[in-house]
Amino acid sequence: MLDRSQRGSRTLTLIVALAASLALAGPAGALELITEAESRLPPALSGMPRGGITLGPGIVVVTPSPDRDVRAPFAVKVNFRPHGGSKIDASRVKIIYLKRPAVDLTARLKGAISEAGIDLADATAPPGTHDIRIDVTDDAGRTKSAVVSFTVVK
């Protein structure tokens, strides 16, 4: 049996844990795509690595649109297009927030990634412009990258 101080301590621990989990969930259970601390990191150095000329998978960004500001929560929808009878290897998709140091968002988005693309109904990010690189590899080992830039407003 717990004494009064142990019960109080345990209750406080549960309240703090619940508050932390609710804070991470964002508005109405939306996935926190980018944290406030991550958004304050310095921008990545410009330039993307260049590969050889191959017909890697196509990457089509549906939302968020780079030419329109978004408000949180917002949808993230990206379609992958395989070529030449190949299939997308969803386990090799990488999603990187382009900051210094780079922030790997892949694990955060794991449930939204499939062979068809990325489909996330509700994401949040702090206000500002964000650049995310998506690397997609097919079962023939061909990789294609695309950078998604979007601006979140209050």
Model-derived regions: residue spans:
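Edge beta-strands of extracellular beta-sandwich domains
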Residues: 144-151
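Short, compositionally biased P/S/T/A/G/V-rich stretches that sit at domain boundaries
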Residues: 29-74, 81
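Aromatic sugar-binding surface patches on proteins
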Residues: 110-119
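Solvent-exposed loop/turn segments flanking beta-strands in beta-repeat/beta-sandwich domains
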Residues: 83-94
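Surface-exposed, short loops/turns at beta-strand junctions within beta-sandwich domains
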Residues: 122-129
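Bacterial N-terminal signal peptides
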Residues: 13-23
